Amino acid sequence: MSDYRKLAFVGNVGSGKSTIVRTLSEIEVVDTDRPSTVDIGKELTTIGIDYGRIGLGENMALGLYGVPGQKRFSMLWDHVNRSLWGLAFLIKYSAKPDVDSLLQVIEFFQPVANDTPFVVAVTHADQADDDSLESFCTVFQEILAGNGLPAAVMAIDCTSRDSAMSIPLYINAMHGARGDT
């Protein structure tokens, strides 16, 4: 594979970043999950960048970067943000959409200014009925539109390779529609 690109998965605790990198990667994943010292609803938490890689097409190697979404990890964001091929914001379904986290990611990563295809992926969507999930997604679609982003909001299952692949395939299609090589 002659062409290397970067796809970053950013999101809050429990959104599925480590899981999606493990699900998609064709190599052994470098993960930075460590036991949590506070109650976050799970045993392990990501304290750095998780890394995996997949082939996409005949000539592309896609680096998969799982990055914590909390602002205190912004020094990692700087590293990952250079030359991004695509950016996915993972948000765990809940009764109340976490709008502030999305706005923080948009402000920092500047997907419009950097011309980076951007996707919002709703995880744990199985916890919602259809109407609740649609309302949840609509909130994010309105925010994206208000920020000039022609991005998709999609529900995914981070443990399913077919479902998780919808993110890189969508971003690849966005590049194709723009005539990017």
Annotate each predicted stretch with a short phrase:
Residues G86-L90, A113-A125, A145-D157:
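Conserved beta-strand/loop subsegment of P-loop NTPase cores
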Residues T46, G55-M60, H79-S83, Q110-D115, ...:
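Conserved catalytic network of the ASCE P-loop NTPase/AAA+ motor domain
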Residues E58-S74:
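Switch II (G3) loop of P-loop NTPases
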Residues S101-E107, E134-V139:
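Charged helix-capping and loop-helix junction motifs
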Residues F73-A95, F109-A113:
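Inter-motif core of Ras-like GTPase G domains
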Residues S83-L103, A125-S132:
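Conserved Switch II/interswitch segment of TRAFAC-class P-loop GTPases
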Residues M1-E43, G52-L56, L62-G63:
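Conserved G1/Walker A P-loop phosphate-binding module
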Residues A128-T181:
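Canonical P-loop GTPase G-domain recognition
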